[in-house]
């Protein structure tokens, strides 16, 4: 995986659960995954959890990538790698950590035999859209999801 002065990207392991939970909560404040769910996810063969850590092995950011066999908006092949989420602690942004996480996700996705890596961002999150563009992602579709309450 990637190594730079002061930090490196590596695969997350069971001992990283608490650090990964804290980073996930920073990205997804409403997430309710617990330790058991995350440990089970770390053991899945069709998903990868990546951490970027400093020289003292303190987690600075993460990426979660999976293989999806269902239709993924804007893609032309199956299966497709999907960057479920990626996050770098604010104090470490602008130093290439996000790009390194995406590069590691690309490498893992290729190893799974996928021809495409997809991701998503909220329509109102211009920062996430800019980060995706900076890493080479191209926008494909913009959708609005609806629901009808039945009960």
Predicted regions and their residues:
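A short beta-loop-alpha structural element at the N-terminal edge
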Residues: 7-20
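Helix-loop element at the rim of GNAT/NAT acetyltransferase active sites that forms part
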Residues: 17, 21-35, 71
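Active-site rim helix/loop that mediates acceptor-substrate recognition in acyltransferases
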Residues: 31-51, 64, 70
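A conserved beta-turn-beta hairpin within the catalytic core of GNAT-like acetyltransferases
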Residues: 70-83, 93, 141
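Conserved acetyl-CoA-binding loop-helix of GNAT-fold acetyltransferases
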Residues: 88, 94-107, 130-134
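Conserved active-site alpha-helix within GNAT-family acetyltransferase domains
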Residues: 99, 111, 123-142
């Amino acid at each position: 995986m990637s190594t730079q002065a002061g930090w490196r990207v590596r695969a997350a392991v069971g001992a990283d659960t608490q650090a990964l939970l804290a980073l996930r909560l920073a990205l997804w404040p409403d997430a309710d995954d617990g330790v058991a769910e995350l440990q089970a996810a770390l053991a899945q063969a069709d998903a990868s959890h990546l951490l970027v850590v400093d020289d003292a092995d303190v987690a600075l950011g993460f990426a979660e990538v999976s293989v999806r066999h269902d239709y993924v908006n804007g893609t032309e092949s199956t299966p497709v790698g999907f960057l479920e989420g990626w996050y770098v602690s604010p104090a470490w942004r602008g130093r290439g950590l996000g790009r390194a996480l995406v590069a590691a996700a690309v490498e893992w996705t290729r190893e799974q035999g996928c021809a495409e890596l997809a991701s998503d961002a909220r329509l109102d999150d211009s920062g996430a859209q800019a980060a995706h563009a900076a890493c080479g992602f191209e926008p494909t579709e913009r959708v609005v999801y609806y629901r009808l309450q039945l009960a």
